[in-house]
């Protein structure tokens, strides 16, 4: 019996798999993941409103963030749909182990959208990093060609996602069965290489973004010492704020993806030391991009609220001061030092 025939013969769930898929732990996991997803929908709406009405980012960065938010909504919707199907089967077919699992051909559409949006979400760090890179080193070009920059980066991000999907899933036979439709097809052999490449990309982007943030802070301090031009000071301040936000986003994205990657790899390495039931109870708690898709709108929304509040406080302090123009300018100079 070859590998394909062996996988096709495993139609019925084992006793451990049945216990895991119909357990209270699995149902609680569904409630937890569904809560994360609905919170991400809510905050994605708030974040998009903030970007459209109270934008604190450059137009290029805003464009990238809006596209990434829309992608995260699609990803979360697909994840929720797969989990609803799984929990439905756990109730309806709890006593029929041969109908509990999904054949991978039933999951073809979910796999396509789940992994494509997953990769697009991961490579958002590339677009955001190079957006900051161009902004810092070519500011005049950046501010006069913002939509060209963002569209170019988004196209590269999409090409990276499609290429990764092609290497990982394209042409892989959809044979065998899975308890949840976003599980990796059994004959997909390049996933470890893909995870290594994604990890290397994110580490590189974190290093570059932290470096750009350091340069932005250094540049802002220098401008504050040498220039009283409101325009220069504003641009420098906005560069620091945006670089800081992007840095936070990338670090959180990395943390969520690594939680998923290392978490699943860790329990897989110890799969022989634990029962099949326990393994399948723990694995669904590690959908890293699901958590990252909640972190993205949270950072955008609360960073926007915080920045607006700080601006109002600063304006309130400046407008509440009394004295002649000379006194006012002296106070401004002192506050900018």
From Swiss-Prot:
GO terms for molecular function: G protein-coupled receptor activity. Its main location: membrane. The keyword Transmembrane helix applies. The chain crosses the membrane at residues 28-48, 110-130, 155-175, 197-217, 247-267, 282-302. One of its GO terms (cellular component) is membrane. Belongs to the nematode receptor-like protein sra family. This is Serpentine receptor class alpha-17. The lineage of its organism: Eukaryota, Metazoa, Ecdysozoa, Nematoda, Chromadorea. The gene is sra-17.
């Amino acid at each position: 019996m070859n590998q394909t025939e062996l996988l096709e013969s495993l139609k019925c769930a084992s006793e451990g798999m049945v216990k895991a898929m119909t357990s209270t732990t699995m149902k609680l996991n569904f409630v937890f993941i569904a809560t994360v997803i609905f919170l991400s929908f809510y905050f994605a709406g708030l974040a998009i409103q903030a970007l459209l009405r109270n934008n604190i980012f450059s137009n290029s960065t805003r464009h990238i963030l809006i596209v990434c938010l829309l992608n995260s909504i699609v990803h979360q919707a697909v994840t929720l749909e797969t989990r609803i199907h799984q929990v439905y089967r756990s109730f309806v077919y709890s006593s029929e182990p041969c109908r509990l699992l999904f054949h991978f051909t039933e999951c073809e559409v979910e796999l396509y959208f789940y992994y494509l949006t997953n990769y697009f979400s991961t490579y958002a760090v590339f677009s955001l990093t190079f957006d900051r890179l161009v902004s810092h080193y070519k500011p005049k070009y950046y501010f006069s060609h913002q939509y060209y920059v963002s569209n170019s980066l988004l196209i590269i991000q999409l090409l990276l996602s499609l290429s990764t999907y092609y290497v990982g899933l394209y042409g892989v036979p959809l044979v065998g069965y899975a308890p949840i439709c976003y599980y990796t097809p059994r004959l997909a052999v390049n996933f470890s290489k893909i995870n290594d490449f994604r990890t290397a990309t994110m580490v590189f982007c974190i290093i570059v973004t932290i470096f750009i943030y350091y340069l932005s802070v250094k540049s802002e301090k220098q401008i504050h010492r040498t220039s009283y031009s409101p325009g220069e000071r504003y641009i420098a301040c906005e560069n620091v704020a945006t670089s800081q936000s992007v840095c936070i986003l990338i670090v959180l994205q990395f943390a969520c993806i690594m939680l998923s990657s290392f978490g699943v790899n860790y329990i897989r390495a110890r799969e022989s030391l634990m029962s099949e039931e326990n393994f399948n109870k723990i694995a669904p708690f590690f959908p890293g991009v699901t958590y990252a898709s909640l972190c993205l709108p949270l950072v955008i929304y609360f960073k926007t609220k915080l920045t607006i509040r700080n601006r109002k406080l600063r304006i309130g302090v400046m407008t509440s001061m009394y004295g002649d123009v000379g006194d006012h300018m002296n106070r401004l100079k002192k506050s900018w030092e």
